[in-house]
Design a protein with these regions (language model features):
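Structural alpha/beta core scaffold segments of enzyme domains
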Residues: 1-174
């Protein structure tokens, strides 16, 4: 069958457009094949979009740290388990290095804080749930995990959370 596909070039490649296996293209082609000579415009309803779209990856963070008598961090250990959004895609060779998806770990593997005895470990979960990004990638979950834990440390040290964060920043930070 001969079909002409007119794509709207707009924005980035987010949502369904970011995945080579997106089924909306096949759906539009099948409709067009059933209606020869008739232009077809496929628009999913919000409900179809939610049911047919991919999911945001579930991520588990386990963060531990040690503080001294003055509340200063003396060691930081962060383990993260989650499914990569890039492994298995055309972007894998560009973004995944040594098995680590940079978009998944951003904000945890490179915190703005000067943390002594810092250790970060990531494990890529393998399960059958299809995942993609939703408005953000790593920072959406790593920011919450890191900053919530810094709040816990400030509380344990009986210090103001903002002052505690400022003390964790490297000298000369803005």
């Amino acid at each position: 069958e001969k079909l002409t596909l007119n794509m709207l070039y707009a924005g980035g490649s987010f949502g369904r457009r970011s995945n080579a296996s997106s089924d909306y293209v096949v759906e539009a082609a099948r409709i067009a094949a059933a209606l020869p000579g008739t232009p077809v415009k496929l628009v999913w309803t919000r409900e179809d979009d939610m049911a047919g779209g991919y999911y945001r990856p579930t991520v588990l963070h386990k963060v531990r740290a040690g503080i001294d008598g003055k509340g200063a961090v003396v060691g930081w250990d962060h383990v993260m388990v989650g499914k990569s959004i890039m492994i298995g895609t055309a972007f894998e060779t560009m973004i995944v290095k040594d098995g680590v998806d940079a978009t998944t770990v951003e904000g945890a593997s490179d915190t703005p804080y000067a943390l002594p005895a810092y250790r970060f470990e990531v494990h890529n979960a393998r399960e059958g749930v299809p995942v993609l990004w939703w408005r953000s990638v790593g920072h959406s979950h790593t920011g919450f995990a890191v900053e919530s834990f810094v709040d816990e440390l400030a509380h344990a040290a009986k210090q103001d959370p903002l002052a505690y964060r400022r003390a964790l920043l490297p000298a000369g930070s803005r």
